[in-house]
Amino acid sequence: MAAGVPCALVTSCSSVFSGDQLVQHILGTEDLIVEVTSNDAVRFYPWTIDNKYYSADINLCVVPNKFLVTAEIAESVQAFVVYFDSTQKSGLDSVSSWLPLAKAWLPEVMILVCDRVSEDGINRQKAQEWCIKHGFELVELSPEELPEEDDDFPESTGVKRIVQALNANVWSNVVMKNDRNQGFSLLNSLTGTNHSIGSADPCHPEQPHLPAADSTESLSDHRGGASNTTDAQVDSIVDPMLDLDIQELASLTTGGGDVENFERLFSKLKEMKDKAATLPHEQRKVHAEKVAKAFWMAIGGDRDEIEGLSSDEEH
């Protein structure tokens, strides 16, 4: 494994579905390139994440069991994807044995995967309760219930959701593209919220973005209606220091694409990420959604585009 290359550690706690099969699903091919290691049991699959915001070279590292995790692997883990057999009532027991390592790594992305929840084994409620308790996201590869076609805010499911989550992560070796309006997506990955702004592209070239000097006024104007639920939620979370953070982030996001600007952008993202990490997991998502709304309005976004962003609001 090349030194300094971050990895998404992939493992399976099922005897009928391997970590390598999960990687095949993620990469969308059975013709995989694998990096040879001294330990044949551990396999590294190079993957270049290339989207409109950034590119990053990472490894999908398949580790069959926790005893094969070396210090080098542990230092490189920035995402954790684990498959379990939901048809077995004890299906989560093996996954739980990985928790001490996951807590040591503290990856931003942690995904619990199964084919689909099972009433005869691990049902949806039990799986969701486990995920909430331990900070994971549940993804079913073949869910019985798919999002309705007329849903204005459809959630991604299956492998698509796994790929989406890995794309949303801010990898340590990320190379930003010259796109000046990627801030909202970066904030989503920073704070852990899994929503997008409706079904629209978060970056609108024609969308007017305000300079930092005017951002505070814009944010204040958007908050005008005290009876508005969304505004009330934003007001309840934006304290003076956080408000300053949002304004600086907005300024950096809408500023020039030079290296110094991006370095400061990621430094600020890291600071805000560390602050969010101090919150209990149950509160982090709510915090993320509220901060995301305030930030979106701070860069001149249209509030109508974020109506219904919160998971607890009616769509």
Curated annotation (Swiss-Prot):
The UniProt keyword set, sorted, is: Cytoplasm, Palmoplantar keratoderma, Phosphoprotein, Protein transport, Transport
Q: Which residues carry this modification: Phosphoserine?
A: S310, S311
Subcellular location(s): the record lists: Cytoplasm, Cytosol
| Expression tissues | Widely expressed, including in skin and keratinocytes, with highest levels in adrenal gland, rectum and thymus.
A Gene Ontology cellular-component term: cytosol
Q: Does the keyword Transport apply?
A: yes
Residues annotated as region Disordered?
197-234
Which GO biological-process labels does this protein carry?
Answer: protein transport
Protein transport found in the keyword field:
yes
The UniProt subunit note reads as follows: Associated with AP-1 and AP-2 complexes.
Which disease annotation does the entry carry? Keratoderma, palmoplantar, punctate 1A: An autosomal dominant dermatological disorder characterized by multiple hyperkeratotic, centrally indented, papules that develop in early adolescence, or later, and are irregularly distributed on the palms and soles (other palmoplantar keratoses have mostly diffuse hyperkeratinization). In mechanically irritated areas, confluent plaques can be found. Interfamilial and intrafamilial severity shows broad variation. In some cases, PPKP1 is associated with the development of early- and late-onset malignancies, including squamous cell carcinoma.
Q: What does this protein do?
A: May be involved in endocytic recycling of growth factor receptors such as EGFR.
Q: Which PANTHER family match?
A: ALPHA- AND GAMMA-ADAPTIN-BINDING PROTEIN P34
Task: Please report the name of this protein according to its UniProt entry.
Answer: Alpha- and gamma-adaptin-binding protein p34
Organism of this sequence: Homo sapiens (Human)
